[in-house]
């Protein structure tokens, strides 16, 4: 299969892309930097095709995914600086990336009939449960901006 992986400059996207390539899949990575800027560890992701992409730009998302023409998109891109996300001057940007950018990816995948996997976080819950979460648990209680915006991303995908 051919995958398009967003956020390959980060830890999760880097590892997801490496695992896909290790298993013999083809992949194109993306992140906001002009060129791959993740860990320079010589792993396959560092040599894989790369597309610079700002997921908050709907037209750019559509152009990139259309041109790559993947069988599936694995959406790992996100604002992940949890503490910095709480800064008043950062909240709109965090929401634009984690909710709006995710909505853009979901909309384009739906339009192109392309499978999409969205990676969220346990920060959508408050961590005060006494039992493991059950599949499709909807007991959301985000306690910070990061968790709230990732939940907004989950809901964007679910409602697209």
Regions flagged by a language model, labelled:
Residues 1-23:
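N-terminal Rossmann NAD(P)H-binding glycine-rich loop of SDR-like oxidoreductase domains
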Residues 23, 68, 108-112, 160:
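Helix C-cap/helix->beta junction micro-motif
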Residues 55-97:
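NAD(P)H-binding glycine-rich loop region in Rossmannoid oxidoreductase-like domains
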Residues 22-38:
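Conserved glycine-rich Rossmann-like NAD(P)H-binding loop of the short-chain dehydrogenase/reductase
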Residues 6, 30, 73-77, 116-121:
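SDR active-site strand-loop-helix element
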Residues 92-104, 111, 124-160:
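Catalytic helix-loop patch of NAD(P)-dependent Rossmann-fold dehydrogenases
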Residues 15, 19, 108, 156:
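Rossmann-fold NAD(P)-dependent oxidoreductase module
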Residues 43-58:
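Rossmann-fold cofactor-recognition segment
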């Amino acid at each position: 299969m051919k995958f398009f992986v967003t956020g390959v400059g980060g830890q999760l996207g880097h590892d997801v892309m490496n695992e896909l390539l290790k298993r013999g899949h083809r992949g194109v990575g993306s992140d906001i930097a002009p060129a791959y800027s993740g860990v320079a560890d010589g792993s396959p992701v560092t040599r894989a095709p790369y597309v610079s992409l700002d997921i908050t730009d709907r037209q750019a998302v559509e152009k990139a995914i259309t041109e790559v023409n993947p069988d599936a998109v694995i959406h790992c891109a996100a604002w992940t600086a949890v503490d910095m996300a709480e800064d008043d001057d950062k909240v709109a940007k965090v929401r634009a990336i984690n909710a709006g950018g995710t909505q853009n990816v979901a909309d384009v995948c739906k339009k192109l009939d392309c499978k999409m996997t969205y990676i969220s976080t346990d920060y959508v819950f408050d961590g005060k449960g006494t039992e493991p979460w059950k599949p499709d648990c909807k007991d959301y209680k985000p306690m910070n901006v990061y968790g709230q915006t990732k939940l907004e991303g989950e809901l964007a995908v679910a409602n697209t």
